[in-house]
Amino acid sequence: MNVGIKGFGAYAPEKIIDNAYFEQFLDTSDEWISKMTGIKERHWADDDQDTSDLAYEASVKAIADAGIQPEDIDMIIVATATGDMPFPTVANMLQERLGTGKVASMDQLAACSGFMYSMITAKQYVQSGDYHNILVVGADKLSKITDLTDRSTAVLFGDGAGAVIIGEVSEGRGIISYEMGSDGTGGKHLYLDKDTGKLKMNGREVFKFAVRIMGDASTRVVEKANLTSDDIDLFIPHQANIRIMESARERLGISKDKMSVSVNKYGNTSAASIPLSIDQELKNGKLKDDDTIVLVGFGGGLTWGAMTIKWGK
């Protein structure tokens, strides 16, 4: 059985926050932010818009793109670190709001690696033969856990969502190879402070980890698929920081024109990062049927996940 993406959708809130916004209250500048991160702007959800709302918008698009009905979905997995509340989960909320029927629904927390973790998890369920259309969503409202007094992190994060339907696809298409992993010894470098409820990060340590793991994990899944870097049509890394992305690209041996860059428009959107990049490349025609692509993410935990896919239904 070939398992892959049968439907796709993405959503970013309408409100756009440019770098000039932060110049009003932080010792920073548009020039510095752009140079150090690659970010020019990010989308933030309104106060009355929560993670489940973002996830819903992306899910509706993915269901329509797959040509199925909500009742055809037999499982929902949502990757998020910013659920509306601890429980019910965002997946529970989607199950009710979409009208899927009383299917299994769960949130999966692997921070910025969450979308990769959830796609890999969904693949196993479909491969078992017991499930046929699994809705996987990566959605985060990072603006609600961003410390706007912290110059090192305040400028980095945005909000958004992406969704896919994982199921059986045509011969020769779908997920080819994958890996996921974690290193809990690095958990102290990127975490949600239990007292303030805000995100804290040791940027230097996270940078070193990210450059190494994104490049190495990508290389391993390419080799596992019996491919070389020359076979890759598009490299879609987690959009955390342009310098991390460029270093990972060089480590993998991919030319600059083959790397997706959307961090300039969205900032770091955690679990939504990779699907928002996919959305951009589909719309601009850079991602086409039968393209071989590499997806890779890293996040708090510390965690990582990577996969190669032959794109198409």
Curated annotation (Swiss-Prot):
The active site is at C112, H238, N268. SUPFAM superfamilies: Thiolase-like. Its EC number is 2.3.1.180. Its main location: cytoplasm. It is found in: Cytoplasm. InterPro entries: ACP_syn_III_C, ACP_syn_III_N, FabH, Thiolase-like. Gene3D superfamilies: 3.40.47.10. GO terms for molecular function: 3-oxoacyl-[acyl-carrier-protein] synthase activity; beta-ketoacyl-acyl-carrier-protein synthase III activity. Keywords: Acyltransferase, Cytoplasm, Fatty acid biosynthesis, Fatty acid metabolism, Lipid biosynthesis, Lipid metabolism, Multifunctional enzyme, Transferase. GO terms for cellular component: cytoplasm. It is an enzyme of class 2 (transferase). Pathway: Lipid metabolism; fatty acid biosynthesis. CDD domains: KAS_III. GO terms for biological process: fatty acid biosynthetic process. Residues 239-243 are annotated as: ACP-binding. It catalyses: malonyl-[ACP] + acetyl-CoA + H(+) = 3-oxobutanoyl-[ACP] + CO2 + CoA. Catalyzes the condensation reaction of fatty acid synthesis by the addition to an acyl acceptor of two carbons from malonyl-ACP. Catalyzes the first condensation reaction which initiates fatty acid synthesis and may therefore play a role in governing the total rate of fatty acid production. Possesses both acetoacetyl-ACP synthase and acetyl transacylase activities. Its substrate specificity determines the biosynthesis of branched-chain and/or straight-chain of fatty acids. Homodimer. The last Arg residue of the ACP-binding site is essential for the weak association between ACP/AcpP and FabH. Belongs to the thiolase-like superfamily. FabH family. This is Beta-ketoacyl-[acyl-carrier-protein] synthase III. It comes from Staphylococcus aureus (strain MRSA252). The lineage of its organism: Bacteria, Bacillati, Bacillota, Bacilli, Bacillales. The gene is fabH.
